[in-house]
Amino acid sequence: MVPGVPLPPEIQLAQRLAGNEQVTRDRALRKLRKYIEARSQRATGGFTPDELLKVWKGLFYCMWMQDKPLQQEELGRTIAQLVHAFHTTEAQHQFLKAFWQTMIREWVGIDRLRLDKFYMLMRMVLSESLKAVKARGWDERQIEQLLELLTTEILNPDSQAPSGVKSHFLEIFLEELAKVGAAELTADQNLQFIDPFCQIAARTKDSQVLHKIIQSIFQTIVEQAPLAIEDIMNELDTQSGEGEASDGDDGEASDGDDGEASDDDDGEASDGGDGDVADSDDSDGADDDDGDVSDGDGGDNDEGDSNKSSEGEQDLQDTPPKKLPAGTAHRAGPEADKEQAWDDEENAGPVLQFDYEALANRLFKLASRQSTPSQNRKRLYKVIQKLRELAGGTFPEDDVPEKAYKKMLEGRRERKKKKKRLPKPQPQNKEAGSEAESSSADPGPGRKRKRNRKTDEKAGQGGPPGKRRKPGARAKGAGAQQPKKRIQSSQSAE
């Protein structure tokens, strides 16, 4: 028998990563990380694109086989962090390129139940790729290489990426960039990050991609403008507060030193004490007495208030809660809605800072080219107008303000209630009733003719008016009566 040829380590690891047992998959994932670290450290080492595609094939099905949500999240984070096992930027980009190629190739075969975990995997891989750029100090060359890789593999018309991959990538890009670098990135660096999207929006012929870029990138920037300005004001306040605190500490230290020196000098000059010192002592004692009295009064008031509050709490505990009728639900008032809105704004994640005037000028330069389609130019001009308004200090308003929208809803509800309450229309005036009676009492000539015909028919038929005879019944009856009379006359003659 011919001895079996050993398979390459990439294929062996890929087979184990796609195994049925979770223990086997976890062990293969740990071995894969060690293998990547060991091979990438060699001067002649490194992976070919085909080898990385085989590795990602196994990682894809490793994620496919994981069903539990918490373990899916942990596995996705572990897979995404493999990018840091490569020691060179070129190797990292090759690894990321193989990932996006694998997702584009396998996207059609993902069913509805497994879609969410691959959405999560895409988000985590994008986040870790941005963290890799952050680890190198947000180098301009590193940023350009990463953006070129992403736009070429995902948003380029020749990439053949499905619309689901494109739309999800555009939805999560700004969010993940803000999470990773909102505290460090400047407005110029943020403009560099979104410049590829500006270029694609100006030249793309795919209306869906254009719409998604405008909604997920530019519209998000416009909507987050108030939060970005608020962050700037908070930073300025904290900086001014820290400066005042440092100045106050220096002033207190100098004042304390001066006070101690003056007290020592006064004590050495006059040990017996002057009248001023005595007066100050008396005034201090008077202040202390007044303070004691006021504190005593305040204590009594506090005791009374505490007793009242305890009684009120007891009453609230004694009163049973009101039961709502079946089918009703608790509805929060407008104040609760406002508080919820404020909480949402406060809980909003980090926000990126942008130079709105510079972004508007960049978009205008791209949109005003002759090669830009007219449809793209119109939509980009609207975005440019909003950005220039932001640069001028005016925030965009909603099409329908919240108060007006609430009034519209209330008006519709009131109209519906009124319609339900209104009774059926009935004659309210006596004149209307008399007119109706007169109209019924004086029928028209056509109705009189119909009534005359009916009365003539009834009179001709005879018999009770309720019974009707078939046509020709009278003639048949008359013909049947004559033979009976003849029979009776013949019998009498005999």
Curated annotation (Swiss-Prot):
Coiled-coil intervals: none
Key words of the record: Nucleus, Phosphoprotein, rRNA processing
PTM-bearing positions, type Phosphothreonine: 455
Biased composition (Basic residues): 414-423
Any one cellular-component term (Gene Ontology): nucleolus
Domain of life according to the entry: Eukaryota
Entry-annotated residues carrying Phosphoserine: 254, 434
Pfam families to which the protein is assigned, alphabetical: Nop52
Chain spans, region Disordered: 239-349, 388-494
Presence of the UniProt keyword Kinase in the record: no
GO process annotations (BP): rRNA processing
Compositionally biased spans, kind Basic and acidic residues: 332-341, 401-413
Localization (cell): Nucleus, Nucleolus
Stretches with biased composition (Acidic residues): 244-304
PANTHER family: NNP-1 PROTEIN NOVEL NUCLEAR PROTEIN 1 NOP52, RIBOSOMAL RNA PROCESSING PROTEIN 1 HOMOLOG A
Record-stated family: Belongs to the RRP1 family.
Protein known as: Ribosomal RNA processing protein 1 homolog A
